[in-house]
């Protein structure tokens, strides 16, 4: 079983789904980026579009659920209540003061992917070890929504407007990070070119 847990596991699930979606949508060379250099630059995957290689930061967000009974089940760690917010990391590590991924990313685009998974963390981790036909048949993504955000305009907007939003501590992958929780209407009014792709899981499962 994969050793990833928590936000790292959710991130790996999101990257796997998005790569499959891009490949099915006419970008056959879409692939996850796993080397250390891309990791340091917050680049999670890449694909070719209009003759150019596009690099992507993926942000997975489990706050997409709407079923109260599933939200109440604490063992369903990846089924949190939908909020209509963006979570943007302003500080990656309280101790080292490393800037968050918004500032550090060298990607061209942010793929902000909300997904609610109606399974336990252990069930999700076990499925990550399975081949694609099993993974995509059995992973219980109940709701999902993809937004594609141009990274440079986002970084410029966040540098100017980020302080308007109260910071919130988040424990992620053993680090104490800080996030700004931004209403989606604010971000999408301030950053030109946001694409509301919508649900993609149905396309990769078909």
Residue ranges, per PLM feature:
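Nucleic-acid endonuclease domains
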Residues: 1-55, 59-206
